[in-house]
Amino acid sequence: LSKNVLPTPVLAYNAKLLNASAIMFTASHNPPEYLGMKYIPDYAGPATSEITDKIVSNIDCEFPQGEAQEVEVFNFAPAYYEHLKTLIDYKKIKELKTNIIFDGLYSASIGYFDEILGVNEIKFNSLHMEHDVNFGGGMPDPKPKYLKELIEKVKSTQNSIGLANDGDADRFGVINENGEYVSPNEIIAILLKYLKE
């Protein structure tokens, strides 16, 4: 059981690390009246239809009554932060003369994104960095139509980049220095090109 609100990538990483499956309750990028259950297999990727079909086929089954077992409350963040150190060159990010503006969209990434950058002394500005079950009356979806405030902030701040994620932080959006939305597919292509070179 997680000690805190938890982004999907943090739980997925720990599932793989601990060779365990995980269950998460999340509305993801949907409106606040929604809530779903996300099953994360031990390989940390999306569950295949073969796996989810088995789960669905057992929804109506009766569970035997028994004594409650002890539940361990766990902090999944430290292992994830250590893993990120092997992937991200925080020093290079710190050396950039770019203003980072992060829109938390009232999501599960609040407390994680700011911790990651703060510990590494990377300055950033932020929007919507408090938990709100109604997502401030908006949608926790990092698409341009829901990022108008972030887009305006980037346009009005010289040499800046805008970043946002959805409710459980497994989808992202990027706003370039001109206030233009850069899709996740474009970002992945840019990263692949960079890694190849």
Regions found by a protein language model. Give the residues of each.
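Buried hydrophobic packing segments
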Residues: 11-15, 113, 191-195
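N-terminal small/polar loop signature for handling phosphorylated ligands or for N-terminal nucleophile
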Residues: 1-34, 116-175
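Glycine-/small-residue-rich active-site loops that bind phosphorylated ligands and cofactors
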Residues: 7, 105, 180
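Short alpha-helical
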Residues: 6, 108, 190
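Secondary-structure junction/capping motif
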Residues: 7, 75, 79, 183-184
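Small/polar loops that bind or transfer phosphate-bearing groups
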Residues: 3, 104, 184
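Gly/Ser/Thr-enriched, mixed-charge loops and adjacent short helices
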Residues: 35-157
